[in-house]
Amino acid sequence: MTTQAAEVAKRRTFAIISHPDAGKTTITEKLLLMGKAIEVAGTVKSRKSDRHATSDWMEMEKQRGISITTSVMQFPYREHIVNLLDTPGHEDFSEDTYRTLTAVDSALMVLDGGKGVEPRTIALMDVCRLRDTPIVSFINKLDRDIRDPIELLDEIEAVLKIKAAPITWPIGCYKDFKGVYHLSGDYIVVYTPGHGHERTEAKIIQKLDSDEARDHLGDMYERFVEELELVQGACHEFEPEAFLKGEMTPVFFGTALGNFGVDHVLDAVVDWAPRPLPRAANERTVEPTEEKFSGFVFKIQANMDPKHRDRIAFMRICSGKYTQGMKMRHARLGKDVRVGDALTFFSSEREHLEEAYAGDIIGLHNHGTIQIGDTFTEGENLGFTGIPHFAPELFRRVRLKDPLKSKQLRQGLQELAEEGATQVFFPERNNDIVLGAVGVLQFDVVASRLKEEYKVECAYEAINVWSARWIECSDEKKLKEFKDKAYENLAVDGGGHLTYLAPTRVNLSLMEERWPEIKFRATREHH
């Protein structure tokens, strides 16, 4: 095996998906603890350790205790290199989250054992399903009261349309939580409370049919054995092939806060989740073990470093090897650039990088020329596909508090739009600026970042827009005719694409009927 093939085989790149408050930040922290990336897992609200154990680093996130921006953390575990991509976990999330899921090979779904499948989880699973992403599931908060585990598995199957195969099974919960039983390995992992902040070796009891197991379970023993018979009769057995196709999820139980069960999940990612996968480009499919470098940008983040007004483009490497000082072709611009200072990530601790392989995420300094979806290669003209823009669902008109700052406002919005934090539209018929977002919090984020980073204060007004559609038409004459007729509702987005801002659902349906030659698109690929 070549060095490169060996490096690729070691990599696992995954994201965590969950509904707000299911325990995602805690599990992120505990995963980093497993990978020895941090020495002490502090609780998120009061971290004083040098290496912040989490990715909540922007001003507004610090105040709200939610992870708004996707962050990337790399750590070693059992001879492997794990790349963990954090996704926004709050009520309201942006396209950032969707796009992060295009940069991973598998995902870890965290469910709150007391609540089960929640709306945000459903939305994220829909995105994973577009690419048949393999999913590992962790049912969290066993140190509290949870719903009946069989009921939880039924709900995963019914609502998320994926087969659930339990790997471990909980012994009691809340005050009676005794640990988990490994179904195929026939052993118990004993839960001892109070070790949430440190790495400890869990006690193992071999064989359920043993005196030690009977002592540990006490009067719960008979009931547990009966429950297990039911579980083994009713549940799916784990099939690695079905998991890799995105049809089945292995399910683990534990408590992230108690640092219990998290290592089982990480072992599953290393043992079962795929190494970096081939990627589709317009021209051909790119294999991760190819010698020549290629990668695509899935996110742009402004101002990661308050000391430098910089913007970082996050790139997923798809093939080859990044080495310091190498020359890359920026495919969209057809220009060659030399990259000497790519970054690797440990949350906001940024370190310079010597080399990286397929599956790794690196950060490129961006001076305004890189956009989301851009492909970089070692000379070949490639364009990776599948990095979408989604039509926003909410719209506001932007009003400046200080009219003299319109230049800063436009620059700020243009940069934030490139970064994917919002979408910006410039109507053809006036000088309005319209913002579009997937969730309400995005508007707050944009206003607070304009104020913090660009020193521009703005307010929002309601606007009569129901949805946006990108316009495509190969017939120039028809397009001109359409533009003349639909002028009142046309706008150009931040990337210069013609967009139709529909005031109502009915209006959009009528337009689609009236103009069959025009394509009204709800998503567009980044080009």
UniProtKB/Swiss-Prot annotation:
Keyword annotations of the record? Cytoplasm, GTP-binding, Nucleotide-binding, Protein biosynthesis
Molecular function via GO: GTP binding; GTPase activity; guanosine tetraphosphate binding; translation release factor activity, codon nonspecific; translation release factor activity, codon specific
Organism superkingdom: Bacteria
Q: Which Pfam families match?
A: EF-G_D2, GTP_EFTU, RF3_C
GO BP, sorted A to Z: regulation of translational termination
What Gene Ontology terms describe where this protein resides (cellular component)? cytosol
Q: Report the PANTHER family cross-referenced here.
A: PEPTIDE CHAIN RELEASE FACTOR RF3
What's the stated role of this polypeptide?
Increases the formation of ribosomal termination complexes and stimulates activities of RF-1 and RF-2. It binds guanine nucleotides and has strong preference for UGA stop codons. It may interact directly with the ribosome. The stimulation of RF-1 and RF-2 is significantly reduced by GTP and GDP, but not by GMP.
Which family would the database say this protein is a member of? Belongs to the TRAFAC class translation factor GTPase superfamily. Classic translation factor GTPase family. PrfC subfamily.
- Name used for this protein in its record: Peptide chain release factor 3
Query: What gene name does this entry carry?
Result: prfC
